[in-house]
Amino acid sequence: ESSNKRENQKQIVDKHNALRRSVRPTARNMLQMEWNSNAAQNAKRFADRCTFAHSPPHLRTVGIFSC
């Protein structure tokens, strides 16, 4: 799977961070995103279900992080 390869993960993270840096107005305290394997696995589980909808909030929590 392509998202498991470090090079692809780096491209995803770099692009995401570049897009976040380009927001206007700029954020005062926007943290840089890092790859999180647990979050990636969680996203893949949801994507594998192939539904066109947002996941419920309780499924968007990985460790102490939620989105």
From Swiss-Prot:
SUPFAM superfamilies from the xrefs?
Answer: PR-1-like (SSF55797)
* Source species, domain of life: Eukaryota
GO terms (molecular function) for this protein are: calcium channel regulator activity; toxin activity
Where is the protein found, in the record's own terms? Answer: Secreted
User: GO cellular component terms?
Assistant: extracellular region
What keywords does the record list, in alphabetical order? Calcium channel impairing toxin, Disulfide bond, Ion channel impairing toxin, Neurotoxin, Secreted, Toxin
Q: Which InterPro entries match?
A: CAP_dom, CAP_sf
Processing and modification events after translation? Contains 8 disulfide bonds.
- Sequence ranges assigned to domain SCP in this UniProt record: 13-58
Q: Does the record bear Secreted in its keywords?
A: yes
Keyword Lipid metabolism present in the record's keywords: the answer is no
Task: Name the Pfam families for this protein.
Answer: CAP
Tissue and organ distribution: Expressed by the venom gland.
Name residues in a coiled coil: none
What does the function comment of this entry state? Answer: Blocks contraction of smooth muscle elicited by high potassium-induced depolarization, but does not block caffeine-stimulated contraction. May target voltage-gated calcium channels on smooth muscle.
Q: Which family does it belong to?
A: Belongs to the CRISP family.
Protein name per UniProt: Cysteine-rich venom protein bucarin
Q: What is the source species? A: Bungarus candidus
